[in-house]
Structure formats: structure tokens, C-alpha cells
Amino acid sequence: MFHVQKELGSHEAVIVALFEEEKTSSFVKELDKAFEGQLQVLLEEKELSTKKKAISKVHSLGKTNVKRYYFVGLGKKESYTTEILRAALGKAFKTLQAAKVQDAAILLDSFVTEKLDAIDVAHIAAEVQGLGTYELQTYKSDKKDRVELEKFTAITAEDTQEIEAALTVGYVHGRATNSARTLVNMPPNVLTATKLAEYAVELAEKYDMDYKVLEKEEMEELGMGALLAVNQGSVEPPKMIALIYKGKEEWTDVIGFVGKGITYDTGGYSLKPREGMVGMKGDMGGAAAVLGAMEIIGELRPEQNVIAVIPSTDNVVSGTAFKPDDVITSMSGKTIEVLNTDAEGRLALADGITYAKKLGANYLIDVATLTGGVIVALGNHTTGAMTNNEELFEQVLEASMETDESIWQLPIFDRDKERVRNSKFADLNNSPGREGHAVMAGTFLGEFAEDTPWVHLDIAGTSESSGAHDLGPAGATGAMVRTLATLVERFGEE
């Protein structure tokens, strides 16, 4: 699909950058000759807009080998960022898709500035082409045919091999994010814990990773009482899924991802209201993020060791379901007083974190649609983060900045630890109250990470979008897939 050329050929469409300061760039001047001065007129009349994310279409009317030019407004160069580039290109690719373009090119060098080189632009362009044109996988009987972009050519004076490599990496990042989106969007009667495990196994086998899927009996032997408690009310068997990627000869410096895999959450006996239950098929967004990251890792083969652990079940009501006031024993040996069965994700993750440590994780990053509290605190565009290790958090933060997936650190104070340790009957309680809800959930998980360097990512607000946006439709976003993969790719770099 991707090609790199030094010069422009014949294409249905060509994407060109347009900065406010460069209305008379060398390319625009050259193209204006073919248009006999009319392009400059369009600029002067402001029919070609330089505003951020503005897309202006110009038909060549046979004056060049290109059918249509799509000028992408980027505003002023001084305020140009990768986030602006992603959004603008996302909108451009959506426009091309709506026009059913199958052969397009991008004048890569027109997007290059002192801040962004051609490799950065190539990576983002290939990534965003996939993200921006993603469509919901529906179960409708009347499905419309989709016209795909079949050929995409980067026109640049830069080294062809380096640009090809950047296009490949960007494409893989976009595709894996879309894989995660599709998982999150799947209905819960289709994506059970068993089906999620089957998906993970297929992924592991495709990329020659080791894997384990623990069944209920094995979990009982290992004492995974927290995950098993959440599963008590279900007819669907639980799964503890582990994918193991060995990128080094020695099994050292192992990065452990733990993704919450609650395939549907009714709240249990702490039952959600009707309006709060719809959409809870997405409560396995953390698991999807981890699997998406492992897809990228499997494809690109970084020289790192990575474990992905997914504790998976649904959380439903029945005569056998766990109840408020229950006291359960986690795999770590720590006992937990259940005050809220709708705080089940942290219970599943507690055993997931302990199991990841057992498998050899030296660093832990958990990802979960964990609390509504993080949405109240940070909204729908920023992931909440907590940590016991600033050095590890800084690496996660840098990866998130590279991928434009915003995260913000929340605190853990000793008084927060005292609140989750406050129980007359057990070592911990799973829900100290609504105050500081997101912080309480993260603090609880920190009790199981213990001294292992750990970062918690609460994607409850960022995992899904209520409306269409520049990088995709309403629904799952694939939040943190690219950040996790970038963390692994950059891990340990100075």
C-alpha cells in the first residue's frame, strides 16, 4: 500500500500542507504556474484556508497529472505540533475516504518544519490514515461496501528506506489501535472471557509469543480469590490470560502490562442504574489496550521483555454472586472487605498484578476503565495516572507525549493508604467512599504492586468517545495502545 517517491506522479489526490506564513511556498508557486496564476487568486480570496484543520479541495481540470489537490491548513508554524498534524491529517483522510479516493499521495516535505522532520510526518501520516478512516464493525444485515485507499505514496527528498520504515511503524500503530477499538465495541454476548482468551491466544501464536490461559481450577490452586469472587455470579468461566514476549536473551528488565478484562459490568449487587449500565461492554478497554500494544510489539519486535496479563470475567448478579460485606483473600494473601461490588475491576487487577509479578515482571503498568471519578477530575480527553516510581512514570509520560495521548498524574498520600487499609475485618477495603474515588482505586492497586515500580492508568474517560472526532467515529478510541507500545520501544533510553 505504501510507496516512497522523489517526484510527484499521476494520482487521484495529493495532500499538501498550507501554513499561514507560506502561502507562496516553492511548491505553491510551482503549482500556480500550472494553474496560470489562479491558485494565488484563491489564496488571496481566502478560498484556500490556512486555518488549522481546514481542508480545501482544488480540481486540476487536467492542468496537471493529479486530479485533485487537498490543501491542509495548519495555522502558524510557531504553534505547529504533532497533535495539530494528527488532527488535520485525520480530517484530510476522512475527506478522501468520503470521496472514495483509492490512489493518493502526500507531499511529505511540505509538512516538515524545524520541530517535525520527515520521519515524524511519515509515521503520523500512516498511523492517522488508519485511525481517521476506521469504521465501526457492525452486526447489521445490510452492510455497505467500503472503498479503501489502495495506494498511498509519500513524496519526499529524504532517504527512501528511512521513510518506508517510518510509514510501516505508523501503519502498525494505527492498525493495532483499531484492533483494540474493535474489541471494545464488540457486544458482551459475543466477547466473553473465553472469546477474549481465544483472541489473545491467536495473537500470541501469530507472533510466536509464549502464552498461558489459566482456568478456574488453576486459579483456585493459586489462590486468586479476588478475581474468582467477581466471577462468582457468572455462568461464564473466568480466564487469567498471559502473553509473554521475549525480546532479549536474558529474562531481565521485564515490563509487565496488566489490563482489566471485565467483559460486562452490571455492578453486581451494588447494581448500576439503567443509564449507567448501557455501554459497560467497554469495561475491558484496558485488556484491549494491552492486546493492541502486544500486536505492535509482536509486529515490530523490539529488544525488550514484556508480559501482558489480563484477568477476565463479567460482573453479574445471581444467587451465587459475591456481596457487600464479603471478605475475600487475594492471590497476594491480603484479605479484602468488599464494600462495593461495583468496585470489581480493582479486585480483578489485584490478582492480575500479583500474577504478573509471579511471572517475572520488574516493572508494572496497569490499564483500566476503572472509575467514574477520573472523568469528573480530568474529563474525557486525559487519562489519569498514579505511580510509586517517578522514573517509570516519566518514561510513560514521554511516550504519551510522543503519541499525543494526554495523561495527568494524580497523587498518592499516606492518608489515602490509610483509607484503603481501614477495615475491622480485613487487611483492605475495596471502596472507602466517593471522595477522591479515582485516587482510592489507584491507591488500592498500589497495595499489590508493593515495591515493584508501577504506573496505574485509568482510561475510564478516554477509552470511548461519545461522538465522531478527527481520529475516528464515536465509540472506542483504543486509548493507550500506542503509548504502551512506544514505552516499550523507547524503554531505558537516556
Curated annotation (Swiss-Prot):
The active site is at residues 272, 346. Its cofactor is Mn(2+). Disulfide bonds: none annotated. Keywords: Aminopeptidase, Cytoplasm, Hydrolase, Manganese, Metal-binding, Protease. It is found in: Cytoplasm. InterPro entries: Leucine_aapep/pepB, Macro_dom-like, Peptidase_M17_C, Peptidase_M17_leu_NH2_pept, Peptidase_M17_N. Its EC number is 3.4.11.1, 3.4.11.10. It comes from the Bacteria. GO terms for cellular component: cytoplasm. Mn(2+) 2 binds at residues 260, 265, 283, 344. Binds 2 manganese ions per subunit. GO terms for molecular function: manganese ion binding; metalloaminopeptidase activity. Mn(2+) 1 binds at residues 265, 342, 344. GO terms for biological process: proteolysis. It catalyses: Release of an N-terminal amino acid, Xaa-|-Yaa-, in which Xaa is preferably Leu, but may be other amino acids including Pro although not Arg or Lys, and Yaa may be Pro. Amino acid amides and methyl esters are also readily hydrolyzed, but rates on arylamides are exceedingly low; Release of an N-terminal amino acid, preferentially leucine, but not glutamic or aspartic acids. Presumably involved in the processing and regular turnover of intracellular proteins. Catalyzes the removal of unsubstituted N-terminal amino acids from various peptides. NCBIfam families: PRK00913.1-2, PRK00913.1-4, PRK00913.3-5. Belongs to the peptidase M17 family. HAMAP family: Cytosol_peptidase_M17 (MF_00181). This is Probable cytosol aminopeptidase. It comes from Bacillus cereus (strain ATCC 10987 / NRS 248).
